[in-house]
Amino acid sequence: MDYKTAGVDVTAGRAFVERIKSCVEKTHKSEVIGGLGGFGGCIRIPKGFESPVLVSGTDGVGTKLELAQQYGCHFGVGIDLVAMCVNDVITNGARPLFFLDYIASGTLTPDALAEVIEGIAAGCCQSDCSLLGGETAEMPGFYPIGRYDLAGFCVGIVENHHLIDGTKINCGDQIIGIKSNGVHSNGFSLVRKVLSMANVDENTLFGKDKRNLIQSLLEPTAIYVQLVEKLLRENLPIHGMTHITGGGLPENLPRIFPSGLSPHIDITTWEITEIFNWLQNAGDIPEIDLWNTFNMGIGFCLIVPKNEVNSALEICIKNDFEAWNIGQVVESQNNSKNIGIFGIPS
């Protein structure tokens, strides 16, 4: 009996690291010290910072992985993994510095996992972020053969006096909603339940590019790093930012609000992405559950002074992101931060 007989092929693991090395090292910026394969990844703090603050975030892709593995779509979930982490980190005004990944599988499937790493590297390139290292764990008997799970970890950096934490949000500020790519990486337990029901036509087409149902559902999460960087470079006074993930707008938007203030949005100000209408109709999902589960077409929000709305929208549009003024900041009752939503049928 040996380790390979028990289900762990160490030689294949080493070969896999060599296979992905060039892909990973293409993401490395000048601050990276050394290459792939050490015990720890090393990186210098970029020059020019006087009082840097490090901002960290960690996340996974959830049960979207089940659907992706079912249909052999591995590259996109690599992008999803990066997006879920970097989009959180940038809400504090930080720019992503480095990313780490963790992949666990029942048995090493080099082709599928190489696609995942290629997707992670692509997401890091979109985020101007170095893929500093990672871990690939082969765990026979723990995960089914052919199945894998992902986790990611990102660290960003921002000057202390440029940190955005919501404390500057004022009554009367406006809420800019930036379009999502679709479902992103949340709510897939409900999505998969809908797909398991009878009479689901996977050939239903969505959007201008006429993608089928599965392609639309597996569209990678939008990465907002470059857009936020350009907004900040224009010295736009952003009082708060939120990444709309699990729990949708009702759960995520109020998280950064100071006591005594709450968001009020008007859902008639943007067109709900058609994939959500399909999910509601196919699964007979109550309206309130839809809003409390999915992003409903808004993947990221900015909170800005009223007189900066046009500037914010212009920068978004100039950088190929659809965006709308979807609401405003109001005084709340009893210091509640609960969101007010106009337009949901009772």
UniProtKB/Swiss-Prot annotation:
Reactions it catalyzes: 2-formamido-N(1)-(5-O-phospho-beta-D-ribosyl)acetamidine + ATP = 5-amino-1-(5-phospho-beta-D-ribosyl)imidazole + ADP + phosphate + H(+)
Source species, domain of life: Bacteria
Known pathway: Purine metabolism; IMP biosynthesis via de novo pathway; 5-amino-1-(5-phospho-D-ribosyl)imidazole from N(2)-formyl-N(1)-(5-phospho-D-ribosyl)glycinamide: step 2/2
Annotated compartments: Cytoplasm
Enzyme Commission identifier(s): 6.3.3.1
CDD domains: PurM
InterPro entries membership: PurM-like_C_dom (IPR010918), PurM-like_C_sf (IPR036676), PurM-like_N (IPR016188), PurM-like_N_sf (IPR036921), PurM_cligase (IPR004733)
TM ranges: none
EC top class named in words: ligase
GO CC terms of this entry: cytosol
GO molecular function, one term: phosphoribosylformylglycinamidine cyclo-ligase activity
Chief place where the protein resides: cytoplasm
Single GO BP term: 'de novo' IMP biosynthetic process
Keywords: ATP-binding, Cytoplasm, Ligase, Nucleotide-binding, Purine biosynthesis
Protein family membership: Belongs to the AIR synthase family.
NCBIfam families for the chain: purM
Protein name per UniProt: Phosphoribosylformylglycinamidine cyclo-ligase
Organism: Prochlorococcus marinus (strain NATL2A)
Gene name per UniProt: purM
